[in-house]
């Protein structure tokens, strides 16, 4: 306290002593003269008119942003000379959605605790004000790792090639119960349908992390991200690799069709990539040999397969080849001759002029084909022969479609041989000749008798020479 060091008494023996101070509290004032003194206490009080925020200190920081755990500050209110002011109402504000009592009242020491809660992680500015005096401090709320959950799982890259290298990607975001992002959190990851993924990933400062997923299997893969008891799943799609398209299978599904140019043998071609994933919409080149007819290209369906239809007018084996890129497979199909159109294609005399002895045979060869000239084996051909000749009534064709017809006769001359199948017929003539080996005088007849015996007029006779079966023999010398 401040006062004049001496005072002089007035006529009545008294004098006023004036004491001032800038320090609130009790001040002891002592008056002395000679060896006599007395003391009294005087009190100075803080000046509420100059109340101000003297300090604002953070006492508790980095509390969890759960709306319950509080960061705390201590505000001190003094007058202009630093004297603590009790019972002063301090206005308080907090930003970024934090919660705080709008006013607090100072304790006897001029201070008061301010509690701030928030559900939003981050920095909060707290401002304490009285009169026109204010101070601000920042406090930090942190996300609550105890309530970590999968907030989002979003596909950021889809439809990657199923080559085991190209990746589909997803972004997972981890937050606490109030949506505050959580960095450094370990997220467990699984992927279905044979896809490959890291078993765990760690979130970045923004609470997110990329998840790359690869696969060698085309189709849908369910990717699941989990933390604590929280999980989310999203589907990603892998597509077959058209760059590695190949012929995986070529299978005969129908064989032994008739070679009539319309009934088809069929094959099924399957196109996959290197890892066996079926490829739809792929153009496969097709060839067929031995005169068969096939569309030059076919296009695979959704299951990666396509039907190949092959027709032919030529019986036999046809090699069918399917190709894509540098991949090729071939399969044989068989066309068979059409027995419904069996016909006598040829009837050829291969031995003629046999002796009419009932044993020596003239020979013919019949050839049976279908309408397109394909040889028909195992076909029954009906045979007839004229002029008394003898032949088997039916013959059966060999694998080459031909059969030999043997004809014998005891009657010399021409015999017409006819071969018939269905409504088709051909005829050829063969000749049998009399057997000179068995020449004989068949008859000797007098044709002129009783002629005059004048050495000129003649009696005549006719001799007839035949073989053993009575066939006349010309050019025979008769003694």
Regions found by a protein language model. Name each.
Residues 1-479:
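Thr-biased low-complexity repeat/linker tracts and other Thr-enriched repetitive architectures
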């Amino acid at each position: 306290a401040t006062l004049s060091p001496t005072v002089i008494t007035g006529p009545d023996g008294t004098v006023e002593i004036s004491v001032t101070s800038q320090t609130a509290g009790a001040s002891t004032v002592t008056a002395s003269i000679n060896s006599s003194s007395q003391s009294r206490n005087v009190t100075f009080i803080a000046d509420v008119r100059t109340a101000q925020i003297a300090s604002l200190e953070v006492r508790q920081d980095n509390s969890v942003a759960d709306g319950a755990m509080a960061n705390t500050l201590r505000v001190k209110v003094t007058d202009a000379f630093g004297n603590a002011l009790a019972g002063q109402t301090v206005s308080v504000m907090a930003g970024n959605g934090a919660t705080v009592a709008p006013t607090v009242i100072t304790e006897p020491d001029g201070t008061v605790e301010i509690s701030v809660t928030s559900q939003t992680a981050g920095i909060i500015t707290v401002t304490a004000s009285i009169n026109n005096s204010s101070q601000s401090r920042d406090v930090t709320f942190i996300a609550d790792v105890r309530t970590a959950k999968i907030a989002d799982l979003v596909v950021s890259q889809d439809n990657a090639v199923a080559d085991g290298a190209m990746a589909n990607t997803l972004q997972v975001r981890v937050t606490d119960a109030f949506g505050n992002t959580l960095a450094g959190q370990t997220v467990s990851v699984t992927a279905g349908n044979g896809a490959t993924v890291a078993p765990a990933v760690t979130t970045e400062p923004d609470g997110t992390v990329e998840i790359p997923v690869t696969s060698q299997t085309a189709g849908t893969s369910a990717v699941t991200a989990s933390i604590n008891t929280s999980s989310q799943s999203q589907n990603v799609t892998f597509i077959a690799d058209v760059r590695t398209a190949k012929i995986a299978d070529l299978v005969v599904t129908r064989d032994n069709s008739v070679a009539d140019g319309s009934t088809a043998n069929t094959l099924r071609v399957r196109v996959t990539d290197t890892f066996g994933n079926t490829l739809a919409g792929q153009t496969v080149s097709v060839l067929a040999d031995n005169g068969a007819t096939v569309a030059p290209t076919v296009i695979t369906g959704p299951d990666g397969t396509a039907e190949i239809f092959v027709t032919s007018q030529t019986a036999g084996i046809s090699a069918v080849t399917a190709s894509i890129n540098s991949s090729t497979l071939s399969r044989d199909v068989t066309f068979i001759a059409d027995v419904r159109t069996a016909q006598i294609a040829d009837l050829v005399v291969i031995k003629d002029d046999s002796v009419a002895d009932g044993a020596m045979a003239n020979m013919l060869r019949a050839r049976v084909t279908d309408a397109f000239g394909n040889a028909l084996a195992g076909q029954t051909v009906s045979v007839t022969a004229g002029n008394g000749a003898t032949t088997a009534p039916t013959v059966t064709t060999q694998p080459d479609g031909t059969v030999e017809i043997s004809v014998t006769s005891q009657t010399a001359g021409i015999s017409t041989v006819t071969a018939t199948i269905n409504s088709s017929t051909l005829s050829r003539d063969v000749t049998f000749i009399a057997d000179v080996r068995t020449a004989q005088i068949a008859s000797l007849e007098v044709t002129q008798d009783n002629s005059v015996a004048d050495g000129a007029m003649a009696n005549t006779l006719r001799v007839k020479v035949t073989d053993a079966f009575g066939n006349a023999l010309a050019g025979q010398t008769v003694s």
